Amino acid sequence: MPPKKKVVGLIKLQIQAGQANPAPPVGPALGQHGVNIMEFCKAYNAATEAQRGNVIPVEITVYEDRSFTFALKTPPAAKLLLKAAGVPKGSGEPHKTKVAKVTWDQVREIAETKKEDLNANDIDAAAKIIAGTARSMGITVE
């Protein structure tokens, strides 16, 4: 078994799917760790091509020899809720002013998408987490 590579950094970014480029925030974050920025951008864009239009969080693990691996996460719940509700952004005063409504079916669908990243045992618990996010954004769940 080959020796394990030593991890020197963990970078978390949220980038538009298929649109990573060396400009900030990607370039500076990777540059500090000496990662080949273009190599990452090409790999990320290829991996997220099918999900264009979504913001996809990524965790990049940087090793001592400047190589890297990355793990893609599911899109943020807030972005999925905004898309489902059809509004550009959440409420400035979430508990006073409501900006939109989503159905429990939509919340369940988002929970299905996010299940692997959520700390929930079943789909009902995951749906409650998503409903809480909706509430804090001024979106009513019916």
From Swiss-Prot:
SMART domains: RL11 (SM00649). Gene3D superfamilies: Ribosomal protein L11, C-terminal domain (1.10.10.250), Ribosomal protein L11/L12, N-terminal domain (3.30.1550.10). GO terms for cellular component: cytosolic large ribosomal subunit. GO terms for molecular function: large ribosomal subunit rRNA binding; structural constituent of ribosome. It comes from the Bacteria. It holds the Pfam family Ribosomal_L11. The keyword Ribosomal protein applies. NCBIfam families: L11_bact. Belongs to the universal ribosomal protein uL11 family. Part of the ribosomal stalk of the 50S ribosomal subunit. Interacts with L10 and the large rRNA to form the base of the stalk. L10 forms an elongated spine to which L12 dimers bind in a sequential fashion forming a multimeric L10(L12)X complex. Forms part of the ribosomal stalk which helps the ribosome interact with GTP-bound translation factors. This is Large ribosomal subunit protein uL11.
